[in-house]
Regions:
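Conserved catalytic cores of soluble enzyme domains
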Residues: 1-66
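Short hydrophobic/aromatic-rich motifs at helix boundaries and adjacent loops
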Residues: 2-4, 74-75, 132-133
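Short acidic (Asp/Glu) and glycine-rich catalytic loops that position anionic groups and cofactors
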Residues: 10-11, 30-38, 77-85, 136-141
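Short capping/connector residues at structural and topological boundaries
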Residues: 11-13, 18-22, 27, 32, ...
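Short, exposed beta-strand "edge-strand" segments with a Pro/Gly-rich flavor and a Y/T-containing core
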Residues: 16-21, 38-45, 88-97, 142-149
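Short C-terminal domain-edge/linker segments immediately following a structured domain
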Residues: 29-31, 73-75, 166
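Terminal amphipathic helices with adjacent charged low-complexity linkers/tails
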Residues: 42-103
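Non-catalytic terminal/interface segments that mediate subunit docking, oligomerization
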Residues: 94-166
């Protein structure tokens, strides 16, 4: 955030053509591409945070297309039962709930690495492990737009599925 920008032409050209004043952050900063355009999959406050995120992402991916993703033995019991699942989803179908609570209850060690967290928030995509195996997760988020899919969330989901299938 505040150190990286993406745009075709800078603020000076925008000002000379449209007479609008805009700074680099507003034109193509982390918030613009992480929340609005969806060009950025991740944003980080600092470079060290970014490196931690990159390492986490790579822990779910194979070294190449001929190898399986890394297997990491989970610390939790694969036969575990969790009463939270009985309480997360409300009895009334019109009441929203947070799908992240469901995901984090089901996946190994409650560890879910969300991709495009701030973009098209009515759809959740990310990586986790089940039984030590890396999986991609796509889930509607009832807390945002009642989980209804729109163009942005559909593109987000399709893009993530293609990435997982590569």
């Amino acid at each position: 955030e505040s150190t990286s920008h993406m745009f075709v032409t800078g603020p000076n050209v925008i000002k000379s053509v449209t007479h609008e004043e805009i700074d680099m952050e507003g034109l193509g900063g982390a918030a613009v591409h992480g929340e609005t355009s969806g060009v950025s999959h991740f944003t980080s406050e600092t470079e060290p945070d970014c490196i931690v995120g990159i390492k986490k992402l790579l822990s779910f991916l194979p070294q190449n297309n001929l190898e399986p993703p890394p297997f990491i033995e989970p610390d939790d019991d694969p036969e575990r039962e969790d009463d939270r699942l009985d309480r997360v989803v409300p009895d009334h179908p019109e009441k929203p709930y947070n799908m992240l609570d469901v995901i984090e209850t089901v996946v190994d060690d409650g560890d879910f690495f969300e991709v495009h967290k701030a973009y098209a928030q009515n759809l959740i995509v990310g990586f986790a492990r089940l039984g030590g195996h890396s999986v991609g997760i796509v889930a509607q988020q009832p807390m945002v737009l009642a989980g209804c899919l729109d163009i942005a969330s559909s593109l987000k989901g399709a893009r993530f599925v293609r990435f997982c299938d590569a």
